[in-house]
């Protein structure tokens, strides 16, 4: 009998989603499985989407972010009696297999990179508060700053939601109040928005403000200058999730005791043109400039 895998998504980032779907489809095809894709959101709840997948005869479900952290999704999967693999959760729920990177270490590595360029006035745009990866990335930023003997004040952290629009609002606030020499955004969408706001204010990236992101989606090489970011191997994480779910399904069919497995993928710090050495004295001088003036 051909294995059927369900994938349910509600990620607002088109760049992230396209890579994830591509990896899932490729591995499903290689494994001879049928991939059934469902979107939730709007009028349909996560529970309803998962119930429809279960009624359609899927043998297991993949839950990428943000659904991997949703109690509604996890409860629906458990009630349906389906094995699930959580992808990109910063703190995977007990009893479920997962694929992720070490968000804490990745964020700390990026913070260290900015510090190594001489930046001290580093601002941070956090991700959606309901996603556990956001908390891990924020912790990594705090740890990196603490290692350098620097405290983090509330005015150098802005709340985002992993969307371009939230990045615009967060960057506007940070540039107007904290005057950073570098901004580290929790994903590439918000980093791209930060660059747009910076340019609009007549500031140069990276001459006046360095900007860094997270994920290394195709957007990172579409913006100008190209974005320094953390590469999260999104497509490979999706492929690994399919492989892991197939193992779980086959184990159940063979009545083998299923093991909870958490597979960590490697992240990479990708240094491009949006970050540079801080200008002399810039760490102590507010970054302001009227648009159109040099």
Language-model features and meaning:
Residues 2-112, 116, 174-175:
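Alpha-helical recognition/docking segments in bacterial nutrient-uptake
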Residues 9-19, 37-45, 67, 98-109, ...:
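Hinge/beta->alpha junction and helix N-cap segments in small-molecule ligand-binding domains
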Residues 28, 144-145, 198, 249:
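Conserved hydrophobic residues forming the short capping helix/wall of the S-adenosyl-L-methionine
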Residues 30-31, 80, 146-152, 175-179, ...:
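Short helix-capping segments at alpha-helix termini
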Residues 59, 120-121, 180-181:
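Short acidic/polar active-site loop segments enriched in Thr and Asp
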Residues 73-81, 143, 194-203:
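Glycosyltransferases and closely related glycan-assembly transferases
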Residues 120-121, 152-156, 205-210:
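Short acidic capping loops at alpha-helix termini that bridge into adjacent secondary structure
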Residues 172-293:
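Flexible loop/turn connectors
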């Amino acid at each position: 009998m051909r294995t059927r895998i369900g994938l349910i998504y509600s990620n607002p980032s088109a760049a992230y989603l396209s890579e994830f779907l591509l990896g899932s489809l490729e591995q499903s095809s290689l494994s001879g499985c049928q991939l059934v894709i469902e979107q939730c959101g709007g009028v349909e709840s996560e529970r309803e989407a998962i119930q429809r997948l279960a009624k359609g005869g899927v043998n297991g479900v993949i839950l990428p972010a943000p659904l991997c952290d949703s109690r509604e999704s996890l409860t629906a999967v458990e009630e349906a009696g389906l094995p699930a693999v959580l992808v990109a959760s910063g703190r995977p729920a007990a009893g479920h297999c997962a694929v992720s990177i070490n968000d804490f270490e990745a964020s700390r590595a990026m913070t260290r990179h900015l510090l190594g360029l001489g930046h001290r006035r580093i601002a941070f745009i956090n991700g959606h508060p309901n996603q556990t990866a956001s908390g891990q990335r924020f912790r990594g930023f705090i740890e990196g700053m603490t290692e350098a003997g620097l405290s983090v004040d509330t005015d150098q952290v802005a709340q985002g939601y992993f969307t371009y629009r939230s990045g615009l609002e967060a960057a506007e606030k940070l540039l107007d109040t904290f005057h950073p020499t570098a901004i580290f955004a929790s994903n590439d969408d918000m980093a791209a928005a930060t660059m747009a706001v910076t340019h609009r204010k007549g500031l140069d990236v990276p001459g006046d403000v360095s900007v860094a992101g997270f994920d290394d989606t195709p957007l990172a090489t579409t913006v100008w200058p190209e974005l320094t970011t953390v590469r999260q191997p999104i497509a490979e994480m999706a492929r690994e999730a399919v492989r892991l779910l197939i193992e779980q399904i086959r184990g159940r069919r063979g009545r083998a005791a299923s093991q909870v497995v958490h597979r960590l993928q490697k992240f990479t710090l990708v240094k491009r043109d949006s970050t540079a050495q801080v200008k002399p004295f810039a760490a102590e001088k507010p970054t302001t400039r009227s648009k159109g003036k040099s």
